């Protein structure tokens, strides 16, 4: 598998002004030059979803790009990544919020995060349900070192016409939260992947997580 230069350039142009988060789970640490190749093409942000693989790449990558954590994160792994990533996308339970607060406070830093919402109420997906979101936001005062910047969602694997409904629901939820919680800078919406990013962009996504489409 090699970097698909034409696809990378095309996608970078298509997602503007949203940020392309290159999901690099397909890139082995022995192929770290692929990250450097992506960076030369204009990719500045890499998304990892496995802590051990991320740490290996982090130690071996010598470029100027940033890393974000886009996968499900176990609370006991927070301490290994909190000072190495610029954003944690998938805060999906209170135990994770508490651990991020604990580890960020230890290091005297603010950790930007997104709250993962299970907008379609899928049993197979992580995230808070819509009905729980206000409770989450009302609890944020207990986590002064956690800086919530917006929402993250994963669309169900269904027809694109149906998927669009869930992107719209997430966009509208963020807009309501912006009005109801003006004390927080809620300006990020992480949704859309290789197979559905066009629909996500139509509904205000600011971060597109793409992996397989960048390679061939």
Model features per residue range: what roles?
Residues 1-176, 180-195, 201-203:
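Conserved alpha/beta-domain cores
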Residues 204, 211:
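Active-site-proximal glycine-rich helix-loop-beta segment
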């Amino acid at each position: 598998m090699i970097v698909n230069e034409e696809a990378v350039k095309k996608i970078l142009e298509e997602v503007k002004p949203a940020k392309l988060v290159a999901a690099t789970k397909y890139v082995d640490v022995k192929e770290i030059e692929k990250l450097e190749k992506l960076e030369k093409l204009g990719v500045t942000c890499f998304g990892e979803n496995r802590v051990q693989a991320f740490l290996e790449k982090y130690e071996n990558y010598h470029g100027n790009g940033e890393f974000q954590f886009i996968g499900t994160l176990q609370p006991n792994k927070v301490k290994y990544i909190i000072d190495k990533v610029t954003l944690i996308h998938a805060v999906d339970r209170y135990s994770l919020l508490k651990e991020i607060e604990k580890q960020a406070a230890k290091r005297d830093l603010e950790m930007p995060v997104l709250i993962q919402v299970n907008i379609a109420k899928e049993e197979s997906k992580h995230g808070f349900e819509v009905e729980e979101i206000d409770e989450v936001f009302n609890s944020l005062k207990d986590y002064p070192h956690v800086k919530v910047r917006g929402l993250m969602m994963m669309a169900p694997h269904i027809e694109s016409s149906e998927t669009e409904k869930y992107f719209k629901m997430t966009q509208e939820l963020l807009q309501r939260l912006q009005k109801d919680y003006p004390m927080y800078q809620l300006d990020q919406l992480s949704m859309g992947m290789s197979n559905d990013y066009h629909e996500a962009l139509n509904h205000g996504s600011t971060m597109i997580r793409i992996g397989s489409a960048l390679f061939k």
